Amino acid sequence: MDAIIKSFPPRPDQTSVPAEQAGYLDKPITDRPSREEAEAAVRTLLRWAGDNPDREGLKETPARVVKAYQELFGGYDLCPAEELGRTFEEVAGYEDMVLVKDIPFHSHCEHHMVPIVGKAHVGYLPDGKVVGLSKIARVVDIFARRLQTQEAITAQIAGAIQNVLQPLGVAVMVEAEHMCMAMRGVRKQGASTLTTTFTGAFKTRPEDQARFITMVRDSRSG
């Protein structure tokens, strides 16, 4: 799972970014259609579903869907490395784990484009510097606001933090419910999926893995 990092070419306006960060700019260079073309595609889907896009209740739906997609998939226009770029070195000798638990997120599965709803737990062992806690949550949000698999988003969060902050290790746990499993196919409402990725010390020291998992689980019993 550690290798599931989707690499995209760097943004044309960011060619000066260091090579070690280029892979995390993550804005694909695509032939993005116009808003009008996107709205026309929604109209086609409405017709394919069996409805009439010209009826009163659906006349504004294509425009609303396109506007919603700009928000739901806004992560393609954001850079995780930039969010993690500002760090603090005055940590008063703190050398233990930093853990941000229960970060809620909504994403969409890349197979059926239906929602994934879950929480992420992110921990890291600082190596002389820390990052603002809100930045961890923003990194989760950036990757969540793209078409995803749970395995990929788990590894991407860990990979971005490891490569930009260079901590001693990163631990990420993601728990989520997939609507592609709840609303269609086997239709198992309430089934959840759990994925983890460990880097550095968390990968080589089982005791650190165990402590991370214990600290995450302690929030349930407290």
Swiss-Prot record:
Ranges for region Disordered: 1-36
Pathway it works in: Cofactor biosynthesis; 7,8-dihydroneopterin triphosphate biosynthesis; 7,8-dihydroneopterin triphosphate from GTP: step 1/1
Molecular function terms, GO-annotated: GTP binding; GTP cyclohydrolase I activity; zinc ion binding
Biological process, per Gene Ontology: one-carbon metabolic process; tetrahydrobiopterin biosynthetic process; tetrahydrofolate biosynthetic process
Residues the entry annotates as binding Zn(2+): C109, H112, C180
Enzyme Commission number: 3.5.4.16
Enzyme class: hydrolase
The keyword Protease belongs to this UniProt entry's keyword annotation: no
Entry GO CC: cytoplasm
Pfam families in the record: GTP_cyclohydroI
Reaction equation(s) it catalyzes: GTP + H2O = 7,8-dihydroneopterin 3'-triphosphate + formate + H(+)
Top-level taxonomic group: Bacteria
UniProt xrefs under Gene3D superfamilies: 1.10.286.10, 3.30.1130.10
Keyword vocabulary terms for this entry: GTP-binding, Hydrolase, Metal-binding, Nucleotide-binding, One-carbon metabolism, Zinc
Assembly and oligomerization: Toroid-shaped homodecamer, composed of two pentamers of five dimers.
HAMAP family tied to this protein: FolE (MF_00223)
NCBIfam families (alphabetical): folE, PRK09347.1-2, PRK09347.1-3
Entry similarity comment: Belongs to the GTP cyclohydrolase I family.
Name of the molecule in the record: GTP cyclohydrolase 1
